[in-house]
Swiss-Prot record:
Family: Belongs to the CobS family.
Entry keyword annotation includes Magnesium: yes
Species name: Pseudomonas syringae pv. tomato (strain ATCC BAA-871 / DC3000)
Annotated InterPro entries: CobS
Region forming the signal peptide: none
GO molecular function list: adenosylcobinamide-GDP ribazoletransferase activity; cobalamin 5'-phosphate synthase activity
Pathway: Cofactor biosynthesis; adenosylcobalamin biosynthesis; adenosylcobalamin from cob(II)yrinate a,c-diamide: step 7/7
Cofactor: Mg(2+)
Annotated protein name in UniProt: Adenosylcobinamide-GDP ribazoletransferase
Length: 243
C-alpha cells in the first residue's frame, strides 16, 4: 500500500508520513492510486457538506470551497497559476514558456485566472447545494485525478529529472489503463446520466488542453498537470450545476 500513501501525501495536505524514501518503481505505481485519492477527498468533502447542513447557503459554499482548496494544499492551483502566466508570457515559444513556469512569482494573469476559476467553482457549489446534488463533490475529485493518470499515460513528460520524470518512466501502463476504465465505470455507477455527461464534457476538455500542451511544449509538466486537474474539476461541477 506504499504507493497509495505516496499518492495521498503528494496530492494532498493530509499529515501522511512515509517510512522512507520511495523507490522510483513505487513512485510510478503511485499514479495508479490517483483516482482512489480523488475518492478519499470526495468522501471527505461529502462528509463536510453534511456537517454544514443548515448553514447559510453562501457561507456553506464558501467553507466547502475552502476545505476543497485546503485538502490539496493549493498545489494544483499553483500549477494553474504558473501555467496561465507561462501561456500568455511565453508568446508561443517553448523554452520561454517552460522558463516562466519555473518562476515562483505570480503575474496579473495568474491572479485573474485563479479568481475566475475559484469564483466559477464557488457559484457551481452554490447551485449544487441548492439542488441537493452533492454527488459532484465526489465526481470532481475522482475525474480530476483520473485525468492526471490519463495525462501521464498518453503524454510525454518534458522536464528531465525530478519526481515527474520518475512518475512517467515507472508508470505501469497496462494497469493504468485498467484503473482508468474502472474509474470511468465508477463515475457512471455513482451518478448515472449525470456522470456520463460530466465524463463527456471532461473528455472534450482533456483533449483540448492536451492538444494545447503538445502544440506549445511537446508534452506536459507538473504545472500543466495541476492546471488540467483544476480545470476538469471545474468542468465537472459546472456541468452538474447546469443540468
Amino acid at each position: 500500500m506504499l504507493p497509495f500513501w505516496i499518492a495521498l501525501q503528494f496530492l494532498g495536505s493530509l499529515p501522511i508520513r512515509l517510512p522512507g524514501m520511495p523507490r522510483p518503481a513505487e513512485l510510478g505505481r503511485s499514479l495508479l492510486f490517483y483516482p482512489l485519492v480523488g475518492v478519499v477527498f470526495g468522501t471527505l468533502l461529502l462528509g463536510f457538506n453534511a456537517l454544514l447542513s443548515g448553514a447559510p447557503l453562501l457561507l456553506h459554499a464558501a467553507l466547502l470551497l475552502s476545505a476543497w482548496v485546503l485538502l490539496s494544499g493549493g498545489l494544483h492551483l499553483d500549477g494553474l497559476a504558473d501555467s496561465a502566466d507561462a501561456w500568455l508570457g511565453g508568446f508561443g515559444d517553448r523554452e520561454r514558456t517552460l522558463n516562466i513556469m519555473k518562476d515562483p512569482r505570480s503575474g496579473p494573469i495568474a491572479v485573474v485566472t485563479l479568481v475566475v476559476v475559484l469564483l466559477l467553482k464557488f457559484a457551481a457549489i452554490v447551485a449544487l447545494i441548492e439542488s441537493h446534488n452533492s454527488i459532484g463533490l465526489l465526481l470532481a475529485p475522482l475525474i480530476g485525478r483520473s485525468a492526471m493518470l490519463a495525462l501521464f499515460l498518453g503524454t510525454p513528460y518534458v522536464r528531465s529529472g525530478g519526481l515527474g520524470q520518475a512518475l512517467a518512466d515507472h508508470l505501469p501502463r497496462s494497469l493504468g489503463r485498467k484503473v482508468l476504465l474502472v474509474s470511468t465505470v465508477a463515475c457512471v455507477v455513482l451518478a448515472g446520466w449525470s456522470g456520463i455527461a460530466a465524463l463527456l464534457v471532461c473528455a472534450v476538455c482533456f483533449y483540448w488542453l492536451r492538444h494545447m500542451m503538445m502544440r506549445r511544449l511537446g508534452g506536459s509538466t507538473g504545472d500543466t498537470a495541476g492546471a488540467l486537474l483544476e480545470l476538469l474539476e471545474l468542468a465537472v461541477v459546472l456541468t452538474l450545476a447546469l443540468l
